[in-house]
Amino acid sequence: MRWPGNMERIVICLMVIFSGTVAHKSSSQGQDRLFIRLRQLIDIVDQLKNYVNDLDPEFLPAPEDVKRHCERSAFSCFQKVQLKSANNGDNEKIINILTKQLKRKLPATNTGRRQKHEVTCPSCDSYEKKPPKEYLERLKSLIQKMIHQHLS
C-alpha cells in the first residue's frame, strides 16, 4: 500500500472541489446583491406604511400588472415619485430618509445586460394615479414579483 499517492489524490480532489465552490460563489454574487437589495426595499416600504397617515395625500403614479421584462422600468417610475410628508417634525425626517433609500439604484444583473430584444414598456405618466397607501402596496407587490422572478 502506498499512502503518499492516495494522500496526493485526496488533496488534489479537495482543491478541485474548493476552487469550484469559490468560482460558483463569485459568479452568483451579483445575483445575491440584487436579492438582498430587493429584501431591503420590502422592509423600507413596510416602514413607510407605518407613516402613511403622515404622507401628503397627493395621488401618485402607481404601476400595476406590470408586463414581463418591464419590472425595472416600472420600479424606476416608483423611484421618480417624490413622497412628501404632510407635516413637519420627526416623522418628516424619517420619511425623507426612507424615500432616499428607495431611490438607490438596483444592482446590475447579467440577465439585464444580455437582453437583446428591447421591450416597449409604458411611460411613467401612463400609469393610474393612486393615494400613498395604494402606491406603497403596489410598490411592494412589484418588488415581491421581482424577488419571485429572481428566485425562479
Curated annotation (Swiss-Prot):
Stored InterPro entries: 4_helix_cytokine-like_core, IL-15/IL-21_fam
Look up the signal peptide feature and give its range.
Answer: 1-23
* Gene Ontology terms for molecular function: cytokine activity; cytokine receptor binding
Q: What does the tissue specificity note say? A: Expressed in spleen, but not in the brain, heart, kidney, liver, and lung.
Q: GO terms for CC?
A: extracellular space
**What keywords is this UniProt entry annotated with?**
Cytokine, Disulfide bond, Secreted, Signal
Keyword Calcium (UniProt): no
- List the disulfide bonds in this chain: 70-121, 77-124
Could you name the domain of life of the organism this protein comes from?
Eukaryota
Annotated compartments: Secreted
Acetylation in keyword set = no
Q: Which GO terms describe its biological process?
A: cellular response to virus; germinal center B cell differentiation; positive regulation of cytokine production; positive regulation of immunoglobulin production; positive regulation of natural killer cell mediated cytotoxicity; T follicular helper cell differentiation
Known function? Cytokine with immunoregulatory activity. May promote the transition between innate and adaptive immunity. Induces the production of IgG(1) and IgG(3) in B-cells. Implicated in the generation and maintenance of T follicular helper (Tfh) cells and the formation of germinal-centers. Together with IL6, control the early generation of Tfh cells and are critical for an effective antibody response to acute viral infection. May play a role in proliferation and maturation of natural killer (NK) cells in synergy with IL15.
- Protein family according to the UniProt entry: Belongs to the IL-15/IL-21 family.
User: What name has this protein been given in UniProt?
Assistant: Interleukin-21
